[in-house]
From Swiss-Prot:
The keyword Secreted does not apply. It comes from Staphylococcus aureus (strain Mu50 / ATCC 700699). This is D-alanine aminotransferase. It is an enzyme of class 2 (transferase). InterPro entries: Aminotrans_IV, Aminotrans_IV_CS, Aminotransferase-like, BCAT-like_C, BCAT-like_N, Class-IV_PLP-Dep_Aminotrnsfr, D_amino_transT. Pyridoxal 5'-phosphate binds at R51, E178.
Amino acid sequence: MEKIFLNGEFVSPSEAKVSYNDRGYVFGDGIYEYIRVYNGKLFTVTEHYERFLRSANEIGLDLNYSVEELIELSRKLVDMNQIETGAIYIQATRGVAERNHSFPTPEVEPAIVAYTKSYDRPYDHLENGVNGVTVEDIRWLRCDIKSLNLLGNVLAKEYAVKYNAVEAIQHRGETVTEGSSSNAYAIKDGVIYTHPINNYILNGITRIVIKKIAEDYNIPFKEETFTVDFLKNADEVIVSSTSAEVTPVIKLDGEPINDGKVGPITRQLQEGFEKYIESHSI
């Protein structure tokens, strides 16, 4: 029987009850992580939970969990639900309290829920590439926090779906930031470009992996801003995330990127990613 982790206990889905006064439900007052499972093992799980606790700290949320404890509960959940290929979703909110914008006084216990799901890797997207669109970035100014406030991302993703695309690559003015659920990269003249780490983007775990792979393959990796025009005239474009892995974008706003085919550097990064899965899953 499927199990869900809820506030310190492993329960069945039918027993997983959340209050209507939970601040995650009322205000989006919380954080989350999404962790990939390959061959029954957790991929880059330490990095994910370090970011999870950083996000908690940034919003003044004391979870009373260590990285090691979070990894242990995740392992139990994967084993209980017999997940071979899939993911864990975990979120923490500021807890249950009467509706008031300010933090609850006195403090209440955070609410933590985690669950698993099985799903295949995106083989078709990885092999053949996807269509993308560009859209103005209308999100808040703390995109470095992996918060539950995802309305801007949802609207961007829906815009992509409306135009038969898989991802929406966002921009503030003419400066490309990131995808609605991914980091974005332009590859030009053998160099990988991606937006620098600051409050405008999430420091994606797969982004960190790609940077390490680029170093291993001696591919120049520059963390600097670039424009929408630069992106559209790149030799290759990719987006990356826990679920998307290293996905090539072969068409943007209806126009092909370069010759409309998956490029050689993308293939190198995908090759390196496969090796990274083997060496960084526990």
